[in-house]
Amino acid sequence: VDDELSSNIKLLIEKYVDNDFDVSDYYTDDVITRINNLEISGYENLMQGFQAHHDVLYDNIIVEDLYVHTNYFTSGEIWSNAWFTWKGTGKTTGEEYTNRGHFDYKWEDGKIAILQAYYSEYAENKEAAAYTASQN
């Protein structure tokens, strides 16, 4: 779907893959991020997490099979939804990971106020544990 907000989500995902986190124009400062059952508050905390994917956890990050659409509800709420396959190679383990993901983005006044992410945390937990163990 090629509406402006869906295109913005595609751009944000491309920037994530490219390790480009100069995206503050797209998020509120106090964006709430929910990753499965974990809640993170604030733009800076969200970007630090994304940046750690590139700096600490993974090499060769790619996103495939991306589909995005945006829903405009009669209540006035606007949500963009993205489905994709994320792939990366663990920096510490060397293991190649493939992970299906689904992200929901709530727009308020032209910016993302809520990001909800649903995916298996297996790769992240395994790489984080391996990285932590390698630092001791």
Could you tell me what each predicted segment is?
Residues V1-D18, Q135-N136:
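Short, low-complexity N-terminal intrinsically disordered segments enriched in polar/charged residues
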Residues D20-Y72:
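A solvent-exposed, acidic/Ser-Thr-rich amphipathic alpha-helical stretch
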Residues I32-T33, F103, I114-Q116:
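Structural recognition of the beta-strand scaffold that forms the well-ordered cores
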Residues F73-K87:
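Conserved N-terminal glycine/acidic-rich loop preference
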Residues W83-K111:
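Exposed beta-sheet edge and beta->alpha loop/turn motif
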